Amino acid sequence: MALSPEKKNEIIENFKTHEGDTGSPEVQIALLTERINQLTMHLKSFKKDHHSRRGLLKMVGQRRALLNYLRDRNFDRYRTILEKLGLRK
């Protein structure tokens, strides 16, 4: 379940830290969050899709690692991204 190019560009525009930014932790976290949300909706309809469930767990772990990295490096940016995405913490 890939993101459409339009949706991906929209997320990058909203979370970039500088011009041409596609790889900052904020952008990566936002893209993963959108993919996680899409896959969660898919799994609500297809409960036995265990292959996709494993991919979801990998994405959640990757997002968690990026959030931990951001928390350790710059706590203000960490709090900002949590608020913008509405993630618990």
From Swiss-Prot:
Keywords assigned by UniProt?
Ribonucleoprotein, Ribosomal protein, RNA-binding, rRNA-binding
GO CC aspect terms: cytosolic small ribosomal subunit
InterPro entries per the UniProt record, alphabetical: Ribosomal_uS15, Ribosomal_uS15_bac-type, uS15_NS1_RNA-bd_sf
Q: Which Gene3D superfamilies match?
A: 6.10.250.3130, S15/NS1, RNA-binding
Give the region (Disordered) as residue ranges: 1-23
Q: Which Pfam families has this protein been placed in?
A: Ribosomal_S15
Q: Name one GO biological process term.
A: translation
- Tell me the domain of life: Bacteria
The annotated regions of Basic and acidic residues compositional bias extend over 1-21
Q: Name one GO molecular function term.
A: rRNA binding
The record, for HAMAP family, names: Ribosomal_uS15_B (MF_01343_B)
Family membership noted in the UniProt record: Belongs to the universal ribosomal protein uS15 family.
| Function noted in UniProt | One of the primary rRNA binding proteins, it binds directly to 16S rRNA where it helps nucleate assembly of the platform of the 30S subunit by binding and bridging several RNA helices of the 16S rRNA.
User: What does the record note on quaternary structure?
Assistant: Part of the 30S ribosomal subunit. Forms a bridge to the 50S subunit in the 70S ribosome, contacting the 23S rRNA.
The protein's name:
Small ribosomal subunit protein uS15
Q: Which organism is it from?
A: Desulforamulus reducens (strain ATCC BAA-1160 / DSM 100696 / MI-1)
